[in-house]
Amino acid sequence: MYSKSRKISRRDFLKISGIGLAGVFLGSAIAPWIKRIQQPTTNVTILREDSYQNNLEDSLRRGIAQYPNILKKIQGGRVVLKPNLVDHYPNRPLNTHPAMLAATIAAFRQLGAQEVIVAEGPGHNRDTEMIVEQSGVSQILKDERVRFVDLNLDDCTPIELVSRYTQLSRIFFPHTVLGSDLVVSMPKLKTHHWAGVTLSLKNLFGVIPGIKYGWPKNFLHWHGISQSIADIATTIAPGFAIVDGIVGMEGDGPLHGAGVDSNVVIMGDNLTAVDATAVRLMGFYPERIQHLLLMMPYGGTINEMRIKQIGESLASSQILFQPPPVVMTNINQAPSFWHKALVSGW
């Protein structure tokens, strides 16, 4: 015999509703954290290089060849190299070194790229041609017969953002980047007075066209630097990073810091993991870098236990950089156990 239906009292209804709402709230609060700590295991390569006069081409080619998924994109494909060209201040290591760029061009060609393009959209100085000439990159382009594209002036198309941390729905991206088979971010190993560090993810600011967003891309700065970095990276999904750390910059980067002989090249196909490794090499903590944390729900890895080091060990390569003076977080202050557990699943 079926039991009679029982009328739910107002008190019981509120209890049930409260439990349900609490469950929904808890689930919505925990879900991003669970997604964040489910970081993929990835490889990051550290190469020991103490001079730009070394045979960088062979080292880079061997390093890149350790990433089979990248080799597939290279062979017969169009590769866009995005160096870090900020400005030209003599005797300051502001930019990706021309020798590093030349070696990378040669390495990708040897690995089967049909076309290699160098592209950059500087945000600090509007005169891209002057920066390319004075930095020594112009001669490399001539010697290697490589086309250069000023991304500040390139044709562009508005693209729907993936992460939308900036609360923007779309950002204009240049056709040169959108039409490539592989985008390679080639930053300098530097500190940054606002973002903490400027590495492969921050370097992507230079793909945003100045003709749409001004100089120094102020429209995106107003929507948050870290948020903009993450929105750009999650949307164009660059495939590889090569960090020029043979000579880096510490202190008041990215323009006024001091040079550091850090003697490394760092590379990998998970840009967040590459940057997290570079941050540790500099003596800082990835858990303190906001844009790295924002990348974690989108496949970015900062958990050291999920980053397999290839080549040199992190411990043998580490050099303690002076932190930037203005950055809002103490990037050289070790986070607590609970902080690390909360942000990276330790």
PLM region spans:
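N-terminal and secondary-structure boundary signal
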Residues: 2-346
